[in-house]
Amino acid sequence: MSTKQQEPYGDFDRQRRVVEAPKTAGLPGTEGQHRTDFARDRARVLHCAALRRLADKTQVVGPREGDTPRTRLTHSLEVAQIGRGMAIGLGCDLDLVELAGLAHDIGHPPYGHNGERALDEVAIGCGGFEGNAQNFRILTSLEPKVLDEHGLSVGLNLTRAALDAVTKYPWPRGRARRKFGFYDQDLQPALWVRQGAPQRRPCLEAQVMDWADDVAYSVHDVEDGVVSERIDLRVLADHDEAAALAKLGESEFSRVSADELMEAAGRLSGLPVVAAVGKYDATLAASVALKQLTSELVGRFASAAIATTRAAAGPGPLVRYQADLHVPELVRAEVAVLKILALQFIMSDPRHLETQARQRERIHRVAQLLYAGAPRTLDPIFAAAFNAAGDDGARMRVVVDQIASYTEGRLERIDAAQLGDGRVG
């Protein structure tokens, strides 16, 4: 009787859309296959241009505001680290979860969610725009790495399990669905990735990435708000302030009641690490207290999910569709409270809203400029795609792909040039 332990991931999970030939540039006598398939996937994401562009894309405040702003790139690195830590506790492949964290925002356009809103308006005639669907499009076609037998790009040619791990919303756009994971143009690779998967259910690795994302941006947005003196954590201990936040949260998060949010605010305000921050004054002691707070909260939220999932699923490696991630409702409520703090004191600031309106106008202007002058106004890869497009919708999709690929600096230079201030894109 064999005692060999079964591999958690099989050949089906490691399959790529295009079979790749061995590398040919190695020196004689060297071993070129020392990495796992998922380690190669992680490296491909880490080295791709789309990831580097996130350094000049907004997380909450602009990437050039202050000395140490969080950008989409630094946020993605933090999500990858939190996800990797959770994967250790759950038995998922570490490279698989880490690459999901690295790639989870890789499709974000300039100005983050605000840019998503503008591009969704631009793309109304060709299926809309959604950052998660753009993630998938970048990884499966737009990012140049591997061609199929017809000379068409298959993007980074990641394994099935890797692409599935990045897919938070495994369905196309529908009438009642605000979030979706695939454009209609990308259904063929989507069907390949989701072959045999339970309908509308993300794999465990994607669920881990999703929770790591929630934890990262809820905790770190509050940290940035405290540093910028926009958020004072003492409001959590003030009954009237907490009640107002809970009322706002109830309207924003349908799954959590105002009473649950009030209780969550009370639990958070009672934590010694929260009380230690007090009125932040940027001294050494205050900076240490704030960093201790973020570390403790990330650990609190991640470890709660690990423990609850283990209690439900048992020991051993948990991978793919063997389990779902379980997060205690009280922990979800605490994370929601942190999100509400950022919403109330950062995102709802009138100056922030005015800036966002100007950003959306800029995206609309540049879209009109690119479409009117295409293919001349497009980068060579996008110009070729524009020429090959069969209808106006497909051509607009190419323009949207081009804008989504821009850094904020490049978008602003192009817009400034067309407005006539002498700068060039």
Curated annotation (Swiss-Prot):
UniProt-annotated stretches for the region Disordered: 1-35
Composition bias type Basic and acidic residues, residue spans: 11-20
InterPro entries: dGTPase, dGTPase-like, dNTPase_2, HD/PDEase_dom, HD_domain, PHydrolase_assoc_dom
Keywords: Hydrolase
Pfam short name (any one): HD_assoc
HD domain span: 72-218
PROSITE patterns: HD
GO molecular function, one term: dGTPase activity
Gene3D superfamilies: Hypothetical protein af1432
GO terms for biological process, alphabetical: dGTP catabolic process
Family designation: Belongs to the dGTPase family. Type 2 subfamily.
Protein name stated in the entry: Deoxyguanosinetriphosphate triphosphohydrolase-like protein
